[in-house]
């Protein structure tokens, strides 16, 4: 199935609505490449197939074959979506969506790997529940959680019960980010190993590395996922491991006394604790001894794999960990067979992150071939056959087929959630959302779950937590405490406005959505979050934000759309609506009613429900009437008559001639798409709640961008109008702050490679004051190894001496490497010889023996390392530049598409959005990336043909450049300003001198930016060098009037029209032929330009030069003929005098509209010959000047340089007077 070609920059608008399609045609619509161009532009909708999500998704029929759900974060194939149907009226949706995208209205942040939900569960959610699962179980009868000791199962969950379980991933989840295949680089690192496994399994992919979070617990996360598919048992595994080591410490010490010192066991046991915080100088991270312990805890083998090169090395990077301390008969499942091994692996050469390898549900169980089965670790090799059932070919089956059912897992999670709510007063899913929106999105990493839980609980109790009904993001109403204290922003504002603050008054700050009271004792303002309300979402800026309760439920207002799906009704949005504590399929209809009793007249509005799928929710006319009468006339005698009248009135109002008439009350925020926005068009059966545009340049746009009420439009318009002023102020402020602060490159910003999970075994920063001794394992490249104890103050040279004593290797032959990946330990710099080495307890260093090398070797190695570092910096910069380019492509493509939908060209639409030409705007960014920003620098954009722009540094923006009138700020009325300025220039052209003619002053547009006036340029300028030069008009006649030459020099810098509009034609192919060596830059899909206009193909320069020669030769020939015709009537002396007079008169102010050809402009990737024309009289004068000059050069070989006027020192060929080569 071939992918469709990428969309052009300016696609045509969507087609008119079509008739509803059949199910078969809709299925075909979801397949790219199977439809005509007309149908490929349709927008389809479908539901997420996850039963816990089922969000409505909208996507173009010609887009990507996979769709990412913006609710749960999973990515699904189009054919997997449920209920695929065509959206017949996407115009308004696309308009609002693209407009919001261009205005920078972002949706909720994309879910990271911890927050992607599968079956309603995210990784972070499971981590929060894991401590509870270590102490609680689920009663099979009631499905409720109970303490394990109350169920007579001990204090701690026995992980051996999971010894025969194995996780098999569903095929549809293999590519789900954060749940399926690992994306930290392991697929490349383990490629050869996985290929060998694939060949051993009949070339079928049946064992894949899957994701686990790198938060310091990756080993137990990997084991937990290999067992049950979730990170639910990491806490129990750590506690089981610690208890196991404590109970069997004597056996472990006896077994590993040759490998592990007795003093190390205390650290090994402490590292198993879930809350372990390492002391200074002690590494954090579970090691091989812990994997061996886990194998004994689970009563099953654990196989650790590595890349093929790592498995073949002498290091113990791969091994088979057998439950050697457990009798083999206890390592069996319920069927009596040995528990099959589970498999984990290193994810990279750094060997600092474990990942599990699991099988695929529905495929054959994976088999590990004999050549990949590592040696047993810590026990005799013959025990492998005792604990692992080997196949006939020597391999073994991984995992098994006894998986924990999803239904049971979800029931278990639901039971544990109740315990979490009882313990903390807040739902774990709400804590997970707080972590996502308030910590991860702001760059705060490593915060303990207990701290996040406490912060979330306090925010709920203070009524500061709000949820957006449009994008689902959490927002916090938070004000810095320092703003409320004396000297703070809000405190000073209240005092300057109200004078002396009083404790019996409330002070409102509308811009901060805050109401405060005053505490005279502490002299501070106290925020009252009960009276304060957040008015807009911090992420999508939508106005439908509501408070959140501790259980995760939302405090809805009447009319709000809830998350409950609606199966019927006339509303059309697909969701139920909240009204007076209940959820309805439809919004109510509203009509006025008048009550008259006892001389009183009361007007009231009745809200009527009539089309509910649950009949009990439909309004009862007698109940409604009784409530109205009781509300306004309580206890009135004889009010039953009034009730009867009200009943008749309501029945009359609700009795419709057409049962399909449905006019619900209009409430902002009730639907993703407003009824008023449709403008009388027929509503589709299910209005979009979100839409996803995908394709070659994937951009996800969220449902909140489809929802714009009148209030939102007003706010957005105000933002747009004030954007330029605010950007200017912010820019000036940043400039002031950045003055005197040189830009530095932080080494921490340079990464070794892409990784979706941080390294797990982190080490505490080294401190030379550490009092503990450090035990370092040293290995040499010839196979020797030893454990060396170093003091905390050991220096580099003392380390070298220790190595020399231990291995008899002279210091000058030692190349010491440490860390993962190994890096060379360099000698200290001068003056720092007494500094301790940066080695920590438990580190392993390798010694490379330098054969036949002098002591100068380390300097060479340092130079090599420096070179590699520079290469890494270059690669990092390249990646960053690529990301910026892709962002500019997306914005430019959206702009072109939106302009087409609005029926305008790009310039007509873009000039109405001036912020695009200011800092942060798409055109500003393109110029900044492509050419760089310099005051007065000009540029053009392929999407805005015929327009030239100039950068104004004082205002920090791009302005429209009109040669004859000057520079103008971009705005909706810029064309009117240009016309007015041009007409004014034309009116003044006859009354003022040419020296004051409106132009760029002394500067003109050139290929590299700015070209100086002719009189200021250097002599002998080469064509197309980026400097302007004219065709040359200074006569070589020494008797010419000097005033005439001076006037010519002044006139030459003025701007004129292009030669392409005159009788002299230029061929476009000559100027668009780009050099193969030129650096092409893509600034939008399908559009390329050149980074520097000066890098032009010499062939193009030669072609342009020849055309200039032909042009001048034609003018000269015409003039020679004219002179021959007049030679019979005039004497040679008269002819010379007439030529001088002609040149003098032709350059007087007011006689010419344009000057002489001067500069060549190469911008925007298209080479344009920007020269200037004259009328026929000027052409004749030019010819006369050239002829006179040619003759004068023949007669006088010596000429003053200033009279050459940028021509060559000598003209060697009279037929080519303009040869500038």
Swiss-Prot record:
Enzyme class: hydrolase
CC annotations in GO: endoplasmic reticulum; Golgi stack; nucleus; synapse
Biased composition (Acidic residues): 1198-1208
Intracellular or extracellular location(s): Nucleus; Cytoplasm; Endoplasmic reticulum; Golgi apparatus, Golgi stack
GO molecular-function term, one example from the UniProt record: cysteine-type deubiquitinase activity
Active site, per annotation: 215, 218 (nucleophile), 353
Tissue expression profile of the protein: Widely expressed.
EC number of the protein: 3.4.19.12
Chain positions found as Phosphoserine: 746, 756, 767, 993, 997, 1076, 1197, 1206
Summary of the function given for this chain in its UniProt record: Deubiquitinating enzyme involved in DNA repair and reassembly of the Golgi apparatus and the endoplasmic reticulum following mitosis. Necessary for VCP-mediated reassembly of Golgi stacks after mitosis. Plays a role in VCP-mediated formation of transitional endoplasmic reticulum (tER). Mediates dissociation of the ternary complex containing STX5A, NSFL1C and VCP.
Name of the protein described by the UniProt record: Deubiquitinating protein VCPIP1
Organism in which the protein naturally occurs: Rattus norvegicus (Rat)
């Amino acid at each position: 199935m071939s992918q469709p070609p990428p969309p052009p920059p300016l696609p045509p608008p969507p087609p008119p609505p079509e008739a509803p399609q059949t199910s078969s045609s809709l299925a075909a619509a979801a397949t790219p490449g199977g439809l005509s161009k007309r149908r490929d532009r349709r927008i389809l909708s479908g539901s997420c197939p996850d039963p816990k999500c089922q969000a409505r998704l909208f996507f173009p029929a010609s887009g990507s074959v996979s769709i990412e759900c913006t609710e749960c974060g999973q990515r699904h194939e189009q054919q997997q979506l449920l209920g695929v149907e065509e959206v017949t009226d996407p115009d308004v949706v696309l308009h609002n969506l693209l407009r919001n995208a261009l205005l920078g209205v972002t949706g909720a942040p994309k879910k990271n790997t911890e927050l992607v939900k599968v079956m309603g569960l995210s990784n972070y959610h499971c981590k929060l529940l894991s401590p509870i699962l270590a102490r609680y179980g689920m009663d099979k009868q009631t499905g409720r959680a109970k303490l394990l000791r109350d169920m007579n199962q001990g204090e701690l969950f026995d992980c051996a019960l999971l010894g025969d379980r194995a996780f098999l991933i569903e095929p549809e989840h293999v590519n789900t980010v954060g749940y399926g295949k690992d994306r930290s680089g392991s697929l490349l690192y383990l490629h050869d190993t996985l290929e060998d496994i694939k060949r051993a399994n009949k070339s079928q992919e049946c064992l894949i590395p899957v994701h686990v979070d790198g938060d310091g617990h990756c080993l137990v996360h990997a084991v937990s996922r290999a067992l049950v598919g979730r990170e639910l048992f990491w806490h129990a595994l750590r506690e089981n491991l610690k208890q196991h080591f404590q109970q069997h410490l004597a056996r472990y010490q006896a077994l590993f006394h040759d490998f592990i010192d007795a003093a190390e066991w205390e650290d090994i046991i402490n590292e198993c604790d879930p809350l372990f915080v390492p002391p200074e100088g002690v590494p954090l991270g579970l090691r091989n001894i812990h994997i061996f312990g886990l194998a004994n805890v689970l009563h099953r083998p654990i196989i650790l794999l590595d890349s093929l090169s790592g498995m073949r090395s002498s290091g113990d990077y791969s091994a088979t960990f057998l439950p050697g301390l457990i009798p083999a008969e206890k390592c069996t499942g319920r069927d009596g067979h040995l528990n099959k091994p589970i498999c984990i692996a290193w994810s990279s050469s750094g060997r600092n992150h474990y990942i599990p390898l699991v099988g695929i549900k529905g495929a054959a169980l994976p088999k590990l071939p004999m050549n990949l089965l590592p040696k047993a670790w810590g026990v005799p090799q013959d025990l492998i056959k005792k604990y692992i059932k080997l196949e006939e070919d020597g391999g073994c089956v991984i995992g098994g087929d006894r998986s924990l059912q999803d239904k049971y897992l979800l029931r278990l999670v639901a039971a544990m959630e109740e315990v979490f709510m009882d313990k903390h007063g807040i739902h774990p899913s709400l804590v997970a959302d707080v972590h996502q929106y308030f910590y991860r999105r702001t760059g705060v990493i490593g915060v303990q779950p207990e701290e996040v839980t406490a912060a979330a609980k306090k925010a709920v109790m203070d009524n500061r937590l709000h949820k957006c009904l449009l994008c689902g993001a959490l927002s916090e109403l938070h004000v810095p405490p320092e703003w409320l204290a004396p000297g703070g922003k809000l405190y000073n504002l209240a005092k300057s406005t109200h004078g002396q603050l009083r404790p019996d008054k409330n002070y409102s700050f509308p811009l901060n959505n805050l109401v405060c009271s005053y505490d005279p004792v502490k002299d501070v303002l106290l925020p009252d979050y009960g009276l304060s309300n957040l008015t807009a979402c911090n992420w999508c800026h939508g106005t439908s934000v509501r408070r959140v309760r501790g259980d995760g439920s939302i405090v809805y207002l009447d009319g709000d759309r809830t998350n409950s799906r609606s199966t019927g009704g006339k509303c059309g949005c697909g969701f139920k609506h909240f009204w007076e504590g209940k959820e309805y399929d439809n919004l109510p209809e509203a009509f006025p009613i008048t009550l008259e009793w006892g001389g009183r007249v009361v007007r009231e509005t009745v809200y009527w429900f009539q089309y509910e799928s649950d009949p009990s929710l439909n309004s009862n006319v007698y109940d409604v009437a009784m409530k109205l009468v009781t509300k306004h006339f309580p206890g009135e005698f004889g009010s039953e008559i009034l009730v009867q009248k009200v009943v008749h009135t309501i029945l009359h109002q609700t009795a419709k001639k057409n049962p399909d008439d449905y006019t619900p009350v209009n409430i902002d925020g009730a639907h993703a798409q407003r009824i008023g926005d449709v403008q009388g068009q027929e509503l589709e059966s299910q209005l979009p709640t979100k839409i996803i545009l995908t394709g070659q340049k994937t951009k996800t746009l969220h449902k909140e961008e489809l929802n714009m009420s009148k209030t939102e439009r007003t706010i957005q318009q105000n933002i747009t109008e004030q954007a330029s002023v605010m950007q200017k102020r912010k820019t000036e402020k940043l400039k002031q702050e950045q003055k005197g602060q040189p830009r530095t490159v932080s080494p921490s910003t340079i990464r070794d490679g892409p990784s979706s999970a941080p390294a797990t075994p982190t080490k505490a920063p080294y401190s030379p004051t550490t009092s503990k001794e450090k035990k370092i394992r040293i290995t040499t490249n010839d196979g020797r190894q030893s454990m060396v104890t170093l003091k905390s103050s050991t220096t580099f040279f003392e380390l070298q001496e220790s190595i020399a004593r231990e291995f008899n290797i002279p210091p000058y032959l030692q190349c010491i490497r440490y860390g993962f990946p190994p890096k060379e330990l360099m000698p200290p710099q001068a003056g720092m010889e007494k500094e301790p080495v940066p080695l920590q307890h438990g580190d392993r260093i390798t010694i490379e023996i330098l054969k036949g090398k002098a002591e100068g070797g380390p300097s060479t190695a340092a130079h090599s390392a420096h070179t590699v570092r520079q290469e890494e910096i270059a690669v990092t910069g390249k990646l960053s530049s690529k990301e910026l380019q892709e962002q500019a492509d997306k914005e430019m493509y959206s702009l072109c598409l939106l302009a087409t939908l609005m029926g305008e060209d790009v310039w007509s639409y873009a000039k109405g959005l001036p912020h695009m030409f200011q800092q942060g705007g798409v055109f500003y960014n393109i110029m900044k990336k492509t050419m760089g920003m310099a005051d007065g620098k000009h540029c053009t954009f392929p999407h805005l043909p015929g327009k030239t722009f100039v950068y104004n540094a004082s205002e920090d923006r791009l302005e429209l450049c009109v040669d004859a009138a000057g520079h103008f700020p971009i705005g909706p009325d810029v064309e009117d300003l240009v016309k007015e300025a041009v007409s004014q220039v034309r009116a003044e052209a006859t009354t003022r001198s040419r020296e004051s003619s409106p132009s760029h002053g002394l500067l003109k547009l050139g290929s590299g930016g700015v070209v100086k006036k002719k009189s200021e340029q250097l002599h002998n300028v080469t064509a197309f060098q980026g400097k302007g030069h004219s065709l040359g008009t200074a006569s070589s006649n020494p008797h010419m009037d000097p005033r005439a030459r001076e006037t010519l020099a002044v006139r030459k810098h003025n701007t004129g029209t292009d030669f392409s509009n005159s009788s002299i034609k230029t061929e476009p192919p000559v100027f668009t032929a780009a050099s193969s060596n030129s650096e092409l830059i893509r600034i939008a899909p399908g559009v390329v330009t050149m980074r520097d206009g000066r890098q032009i193909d010499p062939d193009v320069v030669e072609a342009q030069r020849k055309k200039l020669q032909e042009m001048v030769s034609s003018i000269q020939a015409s003039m020679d003929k004219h002179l021959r015709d007049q030679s019979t009537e005039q004497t040679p002396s008269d002819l010379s005098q007439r030529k001088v007079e002609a040149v003098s008169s032709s350059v007087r102010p007011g006689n010419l509209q344009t000057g002489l050809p001067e500069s060549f402009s190469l911008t925007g990737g298209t080479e344009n010959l920007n020269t200037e024309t004259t009328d026929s009289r000027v052409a004749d004068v030019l010819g006369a000047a050239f002829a006179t000059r040619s003759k004068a050069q023949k007669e006088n070989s010596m000429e003053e340089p200033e009279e050459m006027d940028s021509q060559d020192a000598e003209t060697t060929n009279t037929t080519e007077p303009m040869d500038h080569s």
